[in-house]
Amino acid sequence: MPIVRLKENEPFEAALRRFKRTIEKTGLLTELRSREFYEKPTAERKRKHAAAVKRHYKRIRSQQLPPRMY
């Protein structure tokens, strides 16, 4: 669990921003969301494979030259 200590004369909002940043870096929220409901191993593999295919096509699309405009 990430710990953020409040510095002297530091506003609470700044400490909250630091806490949110540390939570985001550790990936705690994404882990919690993924563990919120049970996902069958086959469903997890299927979801990960679909994401990999989507990333692959996105990478190919970004590497292609744009069509010529006449």
Swiss-Prot record:
MF terms in GO: structural constituent of ribosome
Claim: Ribonucleoprotein is one of the keywords in the record: yes
Gene Ontology CC terms: ribonucleoprotein complex; ribosome
InterPro entries recorded: Ribosomal_bS21, Ribosomal_bS21_CS, Ribosomal_bS21_sf
Gene3D superfamilies xrefs: Ribosomal protein S8
Plastid in keyword set: no
Cystine bridges: none
Pfam families, per database record: Ribosomal_S21
GO biological process, one term: translation
Keywords: Ribonucleoprotein, Ribosomal protein
HAMAP family: Ribosomal_bS21 (MF_00358)
UniProt record similarity statement: Belongs to the bacterial ribosomal protein bS21 family.
Protein name: Small ribosomal subunit protein bS21
Organism per entry: Bordetella avium (strain 197N)
Organism lineage: Bacteria, Pseudomonadati, Pseudomonadota, Betaproteobacteria, Burkholderiales
Gene: rpsU
